[in-house]
Amino acid sequence: LKALDELTFDNRFARLGDAFSTHVLPEPIAAPRLVVASPAAMALLDLDPAEAHTPVFAELFSGHKLWAEAEPRAMVYSGHQFGFYNPQLGDGRGLLLGEVYNEAGEHWDLHLKGAGQTPYSRMGDGRAVLRSSIREFLASEALHALNIPTTRALCVIGSDTPVWREKQERAAMLLRLAPSHVRFGHFEFFYYTKRPEQQKELGDHVLAMHFPHCLEQPEPYLAMFREIVERNAELIAKWQAYGFCHGVMNTDNMSILGITFDFGPFAFLDDFDAHFICNHSDDQGRYSFSNQVPIGQWNLSALAQALTPFISVEALRETLGLYLPLFQAHYLDLMRRRLGLTTAEDDDQKLLEHLLQLMQNSGVDYSLFFRRLGDESPERAIACLRDDFVDLKGFDAWGELYIARVAREGVVDQEQRRKRMHAVNPLYILRNYLAQNAIDAAESGDYSEVRRLHAVLSNPFEEQPGMERYAERPPEWGKHLEISCSS
């Protein structure tokens, strides 16, 4: 394992030059201190977890110190926000410190969020607050533990630096890790500013770094776009299967790697609600839970438009057509597993839709339903879960269909079934009220709850003794927390 000063940098994106990013130094925050660190994320850089508790750790990730080989850059990009094109966005408060490669030969971008003003800050102060930094940290590591592709979070560093949002808060910095920070909006920026040479340079860079196998195809750009479509279809299937609502699916928040990117007013479903809107600025419900599926396709078509200089419209259209069938296949596969089914039948989609409608009508807790379904034999589980439903007749009818469906798979060892179902149905999810409790404590200077919650969420499928309160239904106040974009 390495110490912090032993990291090996290789700043490939910075070498593309000033058309793609601007050199900016981070602005330090006052009295930096460690709020929380992720040993699992540190392991991606081969870092010794003990390094998190050294004074230099807080200094490096708060803008006070910088590695000699680091080359901090603010990236330029644009994007469609709530369906409307915004010509210039860019890193308004985050800096790509550089790329580090580990012993396994993997490259990881180090991106410092809340690092101060950049040429792309617009009217912003370039800062991130403790509240939003903790939320992003917990979400990144929780999604990873659920096997949902995501950027990772190495640490949050708190400070005494005041910042103004709806009220005075304290600034913090978060160190985000990802194999790439290239967004759909990077390609859109060079397309709409009519700079085909730079767009080609960006495309060639992305191909060489992240899709080298596509270079062997007759049309490398088309092969790359196809893979971006495939990855995003699979990602959104996982969001829907686990009840994750992103909240701000603008094209500048979409990763070319198909990983969850940029955490704002996100939420996991408590009660199942297909029309749930987690972002209280989203008046029209553009990014509601059920809309994430068509919006994924809309965003891919916005990327396709930006790739028309390199790929024929016909080929792009055909490739976009793969998205929905791929999404459906992944989603149904995940939901069969959540229901404890090991084979596929034609009517499974109907069985699932029927269940979700019943859950919607009765306000049933989405995560706990699936967890409890695996606790006992199908007959006993259905009998136990019945009390959660208002439409008893409807649920009884569904229960009969479900029990018969399971029976058609043959005799199953109940203990094996329980293990198999519990391995895909989490006991612990990042509910907004749990995050809020941890934030309230952290804002008073107590970081123990953030650290405890992070540890619990890092192992969501295993029952953890003494942690029962993290697996409970939310209190009424916890169900309707409105989360804004302010961060």
Model-inferred region functions:
Residues I157-S159, C245-G247, N361-Y366:
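Short, highly charged low-complexity linear segments
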Residues T251-D252, I256:
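Catalytic-loop Lys-Pro-X-Asn motif of eukaryotic-like protein kinases
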Residues L1-L7, G17-T22, G98-E106, Y120, ...:
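Phosphate-binding glycine-rich loops and adjacent basic patches that engage nucleotide phosphates
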Residues S133, P162-H246, L257-Q357:
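ATP-dependent phospho-/nucleotidyl transfer catalytic cores
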Residues L1-S78, C278, D283-S487:
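Regulatory N- and C-terminal appendages and interdomain linkers associated
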Residues L7-R15, L112, G116, G126, ...:
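N-proximal short alpha-helices
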Residues A31-L34, P39-F57, S62-P218, L257-I259, ...:
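Conserved ATP-binding subdomain of kinase catalytic cores across diverse folds
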Residues L25-P26, D125-R127, L222-A223:
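Short, contiguous strand/loop micro-motifs
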